Amino acid sequence: MKIDILTLFPEMFAPLEHSIVGKAKEKGLLDIHYHNFRDYAEKARHVDDEPYGGGQGMLLRAQPIFDTIEQIEAKKPRIILLDPAGKPFTQAYAEELALEEELIFICGHYEGYDERIKTLVTDEISLGDFVLTGGELAAMTMVDATVRLIPQVLGKESSHQDDSFSSGLLEYPQYTRPYDYRGMTVPDVLMSGHHERIRLWRLEESLRKTYLRRPDLLERYDFSEEERKLLDKIKEALGQGED
């Protein structure tokens, strides 16, 4: 995969040289480039200007963005504008991006963008319902979430499949050695070696955690009959069963 990032602060992306993204680069699975679009700005390298019609703040000018993208060698890239008004970033969207060969991220600053910049992009994406100083942190988050899904990046191909959100549910609790730590013990079912009981326990715990912490995820979840029965059991135990 090839990723190009348009930013005023390329140095902010140093963390991507480490951990999973760094390993993907070492394996030759990822080629990532940073472009300071101030280098392509006309008018004394100014990248922002006042909005027509008045208003507070400054807008990112179209010219530096257009010129930067036009010099990037890409066949048919997915061009992503990081914008608080965009669609929410999700695990499903990261899985979609992981199938692409070329991605371009545009990191904004200031009050917003000249609307004409949006004629370049294929996607307008938001990290969440909050505003950041710039798009760099959002871009790093999206790159990390996407790159780890590229085949052969993680040690085991199934590693990411059990992650929270990959199945549509939050991940079940997990434990490692020792069995007893300060009086807190590992659930006996995990010590039983009984694979079916362990599977059911994990599924029930995933449903429980999702129901208690992120019930919104269940509104669009496609339940199996087994999962529906387990959820009813959970609700009944919590005294929230249907009348």
Swiss-Prot record:
Enzymatic class: transferase
EC number per UniProt: 2.1.1.228
Reactions listed under catalytic activity: guanosine(37) in tRNA + S-adenosyl-L-methionine = N(1)-methylguanosine(37) in tRNA + S-adenosyl-L-homocysteine + H(+)
Keywords: Cytoplasm, Methyltransferase, S-adenosyl-L-methionine, Transferase, tRNA processing
Localisation per UniProt entry: Cytoplasm
Gene Ontology terms, MF aspect: tRNA (guanine(37)-N1)-methyltransferase activity
GO biological process, one term: tRNA N1-guanine methylation
Recorded GO CC terms: cytosol
Binding site for S-adenosyl-L-methionine: G108, L127, G128, D129, F130, V131, L132
Matches recorded under Pfam families: tRNA_m1G_MT (PF01746)
This protein's record includes keyword Nucleotide-binding: no
Self-association state and partner proteins as the record states: Homodimer.
Cited function: Specifically methylates guanosine-37 in various tRNAs.
NCBIfam families referenced in this protein's UniProt entry, alphabetically: PRK00026.1, trmD
Similarity remark: Belongs to the RNA methyltransferase TrmD family.
Name by which UniProt lists this protein: tRNA (guanine-N(1)-)-methyltransferase
Organism listed in the record: Streptococcus pyogenes serotype M3 (strain ATCC BAA-595 / MGAS315)
